[in-house]
A protein has these predicted regions:
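C-terminus-biased signal that marks the final domain/tail of proteins
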Residues: 1-103, 193-235, 241-353
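Internal mixed beta-strand/loop scaffold within catalytic domains of large alpha/beta enzymes
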Residues: 92-187, 203, 323, 335-337
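Short histidine-centered catalytic/ligand-binding loop motif
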Residues: 186-194
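Basic side chains
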Residues: 123, 160, 190, 272-277
């Protein structure tokens, strides 16, 4: 068996990086557009043209926050043979359809809990099965900024991953049912990975005009980790005193619990948080890539489990599953990613070339 997700190495100016990306992933970018065109129409009643028009309102905040992202998106569009508006809409997809969040299970493992004294960051990405065919791995040289290694949806400029300064990020989609014109979460992803210091990474959440809701789990190779829960109007930072820091798709901070909307949609978020915490306990002091993958492959309450499988009783468009799982070792600077369900393995290592 081999890794199914293509590894695309990017370098040069932002536009040049995008051009390489779009050219290498043109078919997958087209698949991303087709997937979200269908999803927007089915769940939000939006045509793709309307989605592109809605995405335009986020262009100004993106330009102000991270202008290189705009240039990179333009390069992706040219390379993939699609419009810039198409790529902008992909990168704003969570804000266009914020009422339908991804479901993910995240854990950060600190040195005192790992087998080798390393810091690990891991998660499942629970979304719709067609997204599996859109997955790419990006190795991005962007001097003078840190070099990045991340897993993303084709056409996106941000995703879960880490940089060569030891900063890593994972994401849980959350919702209070409110959104504003601001910086979309996939752009925040990239802003976080562009930093060299944990506090600077946290500042990307705390100092930025945020468009929506979410929780970025940000960790460093120095053994620090925080869940940065946020809404458009506020944020909170959650941490741990040594045990794995775990998060799913409901707010944990008292600041936001009363306004949480996902709890009405995904009751399994409570089950998954309970299981990922409990399943990791027997491995405290022994947590490494293999044991973390075992935790992510937990099947309690299957199909609505940490390793989530499609529920055939749900309408086809509502069937969520673990598209893949990823484990990042922030010290050895290697990520392991599965082609599909973590229970099926194997996890393939990917490093900077």
């Amino acid at each position: 068996m081999t890794l199914n997700h293509p590894i695309i190495r990017l370098q040069g100016s932002p536009f040049e990086r995008g051009l390489i990306y779009g050219s290498a992933a043109a078919k997958k970018v087209a698949h991303s557009i087709e997937t979200y065109s269908t999803l927007f129409a089915g769940h939000a009643g939006l045509s793709w043209e309307k989605a592109v028009a809605l995405a335009r309102q986020f262009e100004g905040p993106i330009q102000e926050y991270l202008p290189s992202a705009i240039e990179e998106m333009k390069g992706i569009a040219q390379g993939a043979g699609v419009t810039y508006g198409d790529i902008l809409a992909l990168n704003c997809r969570s804000e266009i359809m914020f009422a339908r969040p991804d479901g993910c299970s995240v854990m950060a493992v600190l040195p005192e809990s790992s087998a080798d004294g390393h810091t690990y960051l891991a998660q499942t990405w629970d979304w719709i099965m067609p997204a599996r065919a859109s997955t790419v791995i990006l190795d991005i040289k962007q001097e003078p900024l840190p070099r990045l290694l991340m897993v993303a949806e084709a056409g996106m400029v941000g995703g879960k991953g880490f940089n060569d300064k030891g900063i890593g990020v994972a994401l849980n989609a959350l919702s209070t049912g409110k959104g504003k014109v601001g910086v979309p979460l996939h752009i925040l992803y990239r802003g976080i990975l562009n930093t060299s210091l944990l506090t600077d990474a946290m500042d990307q959440v705390t100092h930025t005009k945020r468009a929506g809701c979410g929780s970025f789990t940000i960790a460093s190779a120095e053994g620090l980790a925080f869940c940065m829960e946020y809404t458009p109007d506020n944020f909170d930072a959650l941490t741990t005193h040594g045990e794995p820091l775990c998060h799913t798709n409901h707010y944990l901070s008292p600041l936001f619990v009363a306004d949480d909307k996902v709890k009405f949609l995904l009751s399994d978020t409570y089950v998954r948080l309970n299981r990922i915490r409990r399943a990791s306990k027997p491995f405290i002091g022994k947590l490494n890539v293999d044991t973390i993958m075992k935790v992510l492959g937990d099947h309690a309450n299957c199909p609505d489990s940490v390793c989530s499988h499609e529920d055939m009783h749900d309408p086809v468009s509502m069937r969520m599953c673990s598209v893949y799982a990823v484990v990042m070792d922030l010290n050895s600077q290697c990520l392991w990613v599965t082609n599909g369900y973590p229970c099926e393995g194997p996890a393939y290592p990917v490093k900077f070339e």
